């Protein structure tokens, strides 16, 4: 659990589409949810613009939101991996997911 929380505290969010650096100006006016179909409460309740503002204002809430999001994302990822292991198609699922999840948004 160290990696998701440490990266979250530094403004890096893991999503189903790739990695978001919340400190980038790109997110300043993006009022869409952190992750519309995310697994946690914070994913739909806070916008990327608001979270970016919290990071730049050095609010502790930013660290909490990012950590909760990343932990929920990793729980989702492990559940998905488990489903594909049981289904017997993990070896085809893994390379596709690694490529998708390592994309910088």
What are these regions (language model features)?
Residues 1-14:
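Glycine-rich phosphate-binding active-site loops on the catalytic face of alpha/beta enzymes
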